[in-house]
Amino acid sequence: IDPEGVLKNVPIKTYNHHLSHAAAGFQTSPYDDATVVVIDAIGEWDTISIWDAKYDRNGNACYTKLWGQKYPHSIGLMYSAFTKEVGLRPLDEEYILMGMAAYGQSHYKEAFKTVPLADEASITFRHNLHLGLPDEGKGGYGEDFDVAASAQELVESLIKIVIARA
């Protein structure tokens, strides 16, 4: 990358993935202090994080991580598993699944059986959803639009649990 060694003395700084999301949200907001919730598929190992964010008296943004959930327990990967279930590309076409949700009927209870939580309070899943939905409980949804509506309702209910924790 640097055959002539021009960059060898340039310091390299790394930043935590979820902290970067939190900073982008907080530092572009009009607030001086906030609770910031970050939810994604996987960033380094965190999948959910909750941060206390505020500016100190010198105007520097300060962050304290209050809670986090790690891979494989991931709302984002769960949504990707539903994306794969309807034939879309996981970790790429979730926006299509979200759009499809408006045209389907939610079968929330069936969706919840497919993706059982071991512990609701900590958003801990019984299965690693990185490779898709578990075989047991699959099917019975009907149209792909119904799968999308079920996934959307399930994700929204899980996000409410995370927000209540914050």
Predicted regions and their residues:
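A residue-level signal for conserved active-site and pocket-lining positions in enzyme catalytic cores
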Residues: A22, F82, I159
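Ligand-binding pockets and gating/stacking loops
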Residues: L19-A24, G140, A148, Q152
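Solvent-exposed alpha-helices and their adjacent loops that cap or buttress functional pockets
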Residues: G5-V6, Q27-Y31, A41-E44
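A short helix-loop
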Residues: V38, G43-A149, R165
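Conserved catalytic cysteine-centered active-site region
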Residues: I1-N16
